[in-house]
């Protein structure tokens, strides 16, 4: 897929994503089988496609809430400064919480979010990330569930964007810049 100044090459197919999301849903269902108080927290904006698919595969009743935190802006690399742009609407104290993230890169965003949510005294808190880039990690953080471990490449699709574009791609692709100015 060619764009002005860059090309998107498919890395993970829509079929592979669907199969992995189904498996993650089964694993999460098993882990939370004894709860009736699960709150699934999606980190906006990148996780919205993943969370929509994932909650349909989770076999326990759940509420969905969203939090928007960012360390990217319009850049392709993390700025390391985490800003909360939209907080949860509901209360998570005493609840089982599953935080759903699109990608764990340096770890700064998810670490800050998990710290902030733990301070609200949930009964239990776990994290599920669609993608993990362990080679970029600067903060010691790990999701309990991960869809795919990927190399240090800039990716788009399945909710992930480049300057707010390409979230609608059904696959995950790598961005290869063809313009030396980028």
UniProtKB/Swiss-Prot annotation:
- The keyword Nucleotide-binding is annotated on this UniProt entry: yes
* Keywords, alphabetical: Cytoplasm, Glycosyltransferase, Magnesium, Metal-binding, Nucleotide-binding, Purine salvage, Transferase
Identify the enzyme class: transferase
Which cofactors, if any, are listed as required?
Answer: Mg(2+)
Q: Which residues of the sequence carry a binding annotation for Mg(2+)?
A: 101-102
**Mind listing the GO molecular function terms for this protein?**
guanine phosphoribosyltransferase activity; hypoxanthine phosphoribosyltransferase activity; magnesium ion binding; nucleotide binding
Q: Where does diphosphate bind?
A: 45-46, 167
Active site as annotated: 105
Key word Nucleotide-binding present: yes
State what protein this is by name. Answer: Hypoxanthine-guanine phosphoribosyltransferase
Which organism is this protein's natural source?
Answer: Rhodobacter capsulatus (strain ATCC BAA-309 / NBRC 16581 / SB1003)
């Amino acid at each position: 897929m060619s764009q002005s100044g860059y090309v998107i090459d498919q890395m993970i197919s829509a079929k592979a994503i669907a199969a992995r999301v189904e498996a993650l849903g089964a694993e999460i269902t098993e882990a939370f089988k004894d709860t009736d108080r699960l709150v699934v927290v999606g980190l906006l904006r990148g996780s919205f496609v993943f969370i929509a698919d994932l909650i349909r595969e989770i076999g326990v009743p759940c509420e969905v809430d969203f939090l928007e935190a960012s360390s990217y802006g319009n850049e392709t690399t993390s700025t390391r400064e985490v800003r909360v742009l939209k907080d949860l609407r509901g209360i998570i104290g005493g609840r089982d919480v599953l935080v759903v993230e699109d990608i764990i890169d340096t770890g700064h965003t998810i670490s800050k979010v998990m710290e902030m949510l733990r301070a609200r005294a949930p009964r239990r808190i776990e994290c599920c990330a669609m993608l993990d880039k362990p080679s970029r990690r600067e903060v010691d953080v790990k999701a309990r569930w991960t869809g795919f471990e990927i190399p240090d490449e800039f990716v788009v699709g399945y909710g992930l964007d480049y300057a707010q574009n390409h979230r609608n791609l059904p696959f995950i692709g790598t961005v290869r810049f063809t313009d030396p100015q980028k």
